[in-house]
Amino acid sequence: MLVIKNARVFTAAGRNYDKGDIAVENGKIVAVTESIEAKDSYDVIDASGLFAMPGIVDAHSHIGGFAGYDQDLNEMTCNATPSMESFYAIDVTTKDFQRAKRAGITTSVIAPGSGNVVGGLVCAVKSAGSSLEDMCIKNPSMHGSD
């Protein structure tokens, strides 16, 4: 169990704490409250003077798609490229993903560029992970459109 103590906590439910604690178990938040008694076996982070809030979802991003000279997210071979899949243009080794995590962005919906009228299919990815396959949350071309 990980306990983050003494942070200024903002929750998605609107319940905020000037000085609050967060309990995390197996990578999931299990409690947010004014005070959590931390047992000796718990890992504890003192977040005094720091903020804690839900991760930000960037609903329109080109992160990792314009990393080099390729400009793979901007497919401009014709006016409409509806079958262009942003998944195959994303480079997760760029520093963009590290910057996103530091900024609090935990999920990005990566879209093709605006080089044409219909750019293609988006892909939702986590900011953390070791490979695009691990980071991908939703890729319509691979998982259907549900």
Functional labels for PLM-detected ranges:
Residues 9-53:
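Histidine-rich, glycine-flanked metal-binding segment
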Residues 14, 115-116, 131:
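Detector for glycine-centered tight turns/loop "hinges" at secondary-structure junctions
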Residues 21-23, 109, 122-124:
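Short beta-strand scaffold segments in enzyme catalytic cores
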Residues 45, 117-118, 122-127:
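Short low-complexity, flexible loop/linker segments enriched in glycine and/or proline
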Residues 50-117:
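Metal-associated gating/positioning segment near the N- to mid-region
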Residues 124-146:
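Metal-coordinating catalytic core of metallo-dependent amide/deamination hydrolases
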